[in-house]
């Protein structure tokens, strides 16, 4: 793969044009464009292992051909830390039967702050020989090691990495757990957080956040408002978010483990939820809602829920479903800010953001 700057610029412009065309029916302003480094931008990577020539190699598969492996010696789109670790880990498993026996998959997770974790997946139980070798590996490479085997997990070091991102002149620390979703492009994620921080602005009242994950947006946005009510359904992400709130001394956020659909029912007083025990929703004075939904976008009921807010800050990983949701809201809200974030260079995927304000 060649990392030609002119080709990247052309692909970036194609994405901007696509977003502009999708939002044209809604009189959207010209999008701000946030580009990506051309290489070493991806903070996580996953490889299968493939035996050839008497040894195991890192391998990936094309979406068009799941049978023929593409052997990988280096992975230029991945972070420099991952590229440093790849040959070191390969040398370690080649030298150790305890590490290599029935090893079939390797996952790397790194951060801009320099932290790293490696997950090793096996088709066998992990014994004391593995633990001895894995402990030495963790020390030699200065990483945490996770061993996975048939639903069991062994942790050497931590089961998370720590990221540090600067937003609005403040550095936030994020605990990112193994197996949980994190934004893969740290540089663009930081740009995205700063755009959302600026777009929301200082508010005298409260913010509702749906799909908060590990608190990626929650931490900086909480500094812009009086109080935040944030929702997330994943237990792993909820625990990480609570830890991140505590680590950063952010004390104005209440986090509840509800889906967006369940919260809609709670706000509409359709039925009570035990997970909301002790939380009086009527004490919140919401004027703004922040949403970062999955690729399917917001379901119609959640979309209708957001309509009751004066300001809708929306981050999307799928511009088609973003446009569909805006079409549902266009009669009451207009786009006042728009942005495109190139989270996924060299692919057709993009991240985008809009601020919708009541007409």
From Swiss-Prot:
InterPro entries: MeTrfase_TrmA_AS, MeTrfase_TrmA_CS, SAM-dependent_MTases_sf, TrmA_MeTrfase, U5_MeTrfase_fam
Stated family: Belongs to the class I-like SAM-binding methyltransferase superfamily. RNA M5U methyltransferase family. TrmA subfamily.
Domain of life of the source: Bacteria
One Pfam family named in its UniProt record: tRNA_U5-meth_tr
Keywords: Methyltransferase, S-adenosyl-L-methionine, Transferase, tRNA processing
Catalytic activity: uridine(54) in tRNA + S-adenosyl-L-methionine = 5-methyluridine(54) in tRNA + S-adenosyl-L-homocysteine + H(+); uridine(341) in tmRNA + S-adenosyl-L-methionine = 5-methyluridine(341) in tmRNA + S-adenosyl-L-homocysteine + H(+)
One GO MF term attached to the UniProt entry: tRNA binding
Name of the protein described by the UniProt record: tRNA/tmRNA (uracil-C(5))-methyltransferase
Organism: Pseudomonas fluorescens (strain SBW25)
Primary role: Dual-specificity methyltransferase that catalyzes the formation of 5-methyluridine at position 54 (m5U54) in all tRNAs, and that of position 341 (m5U341) in tmRNA (transfer-mRNA).
Positions that bind S-adenosyl-L-methionine: 183, 211, 216, 232, 292
Major enzyme class: transferase
Annotated catalytic residues: 317 (nucleophile), 351 (proton acceptor)
EC number: 2.1.1.-, 2.1.1.35
GO CC terms: cytosol
NCBIfam families registered for this protein in UniProt: trmA_only
UniProt entry tagged with the keyword Lipid metabolism: no
Any Gene Ontology biological process: tRNA methylation
Keyword Aminoacyl-tRNA synthetase: no
């Amino acid at each position: 793969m060649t990392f030609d700057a002119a080709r990247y610029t052309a692909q970036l412009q194609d994405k901007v044009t696509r977003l502009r065309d999708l939002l044209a029916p809604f009189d959207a302003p010209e999008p701000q464009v946030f580009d990506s480094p051309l290489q070493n931008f991806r903070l996580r990577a996953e490889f299968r292992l493939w035996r050839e020539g008497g040894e195991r190699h890192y391998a990936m598969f094309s979406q068009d051909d799941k049978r023929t492996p593409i052997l990988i010696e280096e992975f230029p789109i991945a972070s420099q830390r991952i590229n440093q670790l790849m040959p070191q880990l390969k040398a370690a498993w080649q030298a150790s039967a305890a590490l290599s026996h029935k090893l079939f998959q390797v996952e790397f997770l790194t951060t801009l702050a320099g932290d790293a974790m490696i997950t090793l997946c096996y088709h066998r139980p992990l014994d004391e020989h593995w633990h001895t070798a894995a402990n030495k590996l963790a020390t030699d490479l200065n990483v945490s090691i996770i061993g996975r085997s048939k639903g069991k997990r062994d942790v050497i070091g931590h089961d998370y990495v720590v990221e540090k991102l600067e937003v609005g002149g403040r550095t936030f620390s994020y605990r990112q757990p193994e197996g949980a979703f994190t934004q893969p492009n740290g540089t663009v994620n930081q740009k995205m957080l700063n755009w959302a921080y600026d777009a929301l602005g200082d508010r005298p009242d409260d913010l509702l956040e749906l799909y908060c994950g590990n608190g990626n947006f929650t931490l900086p946005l909480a500094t812009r408002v009086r109080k935040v009510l944030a929702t997330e359904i994943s237990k792993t992400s909820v625990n990480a978010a609570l830890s991140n709130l505590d680590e950063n001394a952010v004390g104005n956020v209440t986090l509840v483990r509800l889906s967006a659909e369940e919260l809609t029912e709670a706000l509409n007083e359709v039925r009570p939820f035990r997970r909301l025990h002790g939380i009086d929703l009527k004490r919140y004075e919401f004027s703004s809602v922040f949403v970062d939904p999955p690729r399917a976008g917001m379901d119609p009921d959640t979309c209708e829920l957001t309509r009751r807010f004066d300001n809708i800050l929306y981050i999307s990983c799928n511009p088609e479903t973003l446009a569909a949701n805006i079409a549902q809201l266009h009669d009451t809200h207009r786009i006042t800010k728009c942005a495109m974030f190139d989270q996924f260079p060299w692919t057709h995927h993009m991240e985008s953001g809009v601020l919708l304000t009541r007409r």
